[in-house]
Amino acid sequence: MLPTDRADLLVRVEALLQQCRGPQAAIRMVDLFALATGDVVIPGKRYDQTRIVRSLVDQLRRQGCPIAHGANGYFWADDPADLEPTIRWFHLRALASLRQERALRRVPFAAVLEQYRLDLEAQPDDPLPP
């Protein structure tokens, strides 16, 4: 891996993704990892090795970068419509987690949702990126 800190790697990942405009230019995680770090992915270690890059993609999304993903990999979405499948995927994943919580707590799904509504009302909103 190239000697770098997280901030430098974040800049590299963002720059690489900005070059991948639209779903037709998507980049696979293993390729993004290799280009950002200068390292190769070992097949049996793919998930562990790419964890840092996945966390940086998450950080960029939380900063408001329009990073989508699809069957061909990650890409910078110039068209807001290209973000919809990614947004839907996150939505379904969140609902699946809440269903698991409902089953573990043995309460109705509506009760789990109500608790989160109350929790969110008690917390200040996270500022949205510009």
Protein language model features and the residues they cover:
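Short alpha-helical segments that sit at the start of domains
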Residues: 1-19
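Short acidic, hydrophobic short linear motifs in intrinsically disordered regions
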Residues: 23-41
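Short, positively charged loop/turn segments that connect secondary-structure elements
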Residues: 37-53
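Short, hydrophobic-biased segments on the C-terminal half of alpha helices
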Residues: 54-58
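A short, conserved structural fragment
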Residues: 61-71
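Minor-groove-contacting beta-hairpin "wing" of winged helix-turn-helix DNA-binding domains
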Residues: 70-78
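Short, amphipathic alpha-helical interaction segments positioned at domain boundaries
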Residues: 81-105
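Exposed, interaction-prone assembly regions rather than primary DNA-binding/catalytic cores
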Residues: 100-130
